[in-house]
């Protein structure tokens, strides 16, 4: 009886491990697609902002942009550009930028005049995806 339980637990653990590995590989693939937009002149902030989204969901990521710094925000979902809409808002909810007004551009460069905490909202482009991994990368110039 103990051997059956052990085998059942072992099989379940292996199955979960493969599932987790597959999801991690998908997410890493999307991050690699997104990373091509952080060219050599931009240094990554070291974070990979990622989540799984359904078409009716909005993800929120929080970060601080420091005054006097030029940033690049790259946003991807899937293996092609334009699948993720991102909006950057200040603490009052004022929209500082949205790529929706720029044909869902996969990245955008901007200079921050004064330090500000921001929320980056990400939603899938409903015309191209019903669900998917969303990845946002942030780089800055030194």
Q: In which residue ranges do the predicted regions lie?
A:
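Short N-terminal segments immediately surrounding and downstream of signal-peptide cleavage
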Residues: 24-43
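Short, functionally important structural connectors and interaction interfaces within domains
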Residues: 8-10, 45, 57
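Acidic, Ser/Thr/Pro-rich low-complexity intrinsically disordered segments
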Residues: 25-27, 48-133, 140-142
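Bacterial N-terminal signal peptides
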Residues: 9-17
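Sec/Tat signal peptide C-region and signal peptidase I cleavage site
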Residues: 18-24
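Positively charged n-region of N-terminal signal peptides that target proteins for export
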Residues: 1-6
């Amino acid at each position: 009886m103990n051997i059956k339980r052990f085998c059942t637990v072992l099989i379940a653990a292996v199955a979960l491990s493969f599932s987790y590995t597959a999801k991690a590989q998908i997410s890493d693939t999307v991050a690699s697609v997104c990373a091509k937009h952080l060219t050599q002149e931009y240094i990554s902030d070291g974070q990979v902002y990622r989540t799984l989204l359904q078409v009716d969901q909005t993800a929120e990521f929080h970060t601080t942009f420091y005054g006097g710094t030029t940033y690049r925000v790259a946003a991807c979902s899937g293996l092609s550009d334009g699948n993720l809409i991102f909006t950057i808002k200040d603490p009052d909810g004022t929209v500082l930028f949205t790529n929706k007004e720029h044909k869902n551009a996969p990245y955008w460069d901007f200079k921050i005049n004064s330090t500000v905490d921001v929320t980056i909202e990400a939603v899938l482009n409903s015309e191209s995806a019903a669900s998917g991994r969303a990845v946002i990368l942030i780089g800055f110039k030194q």
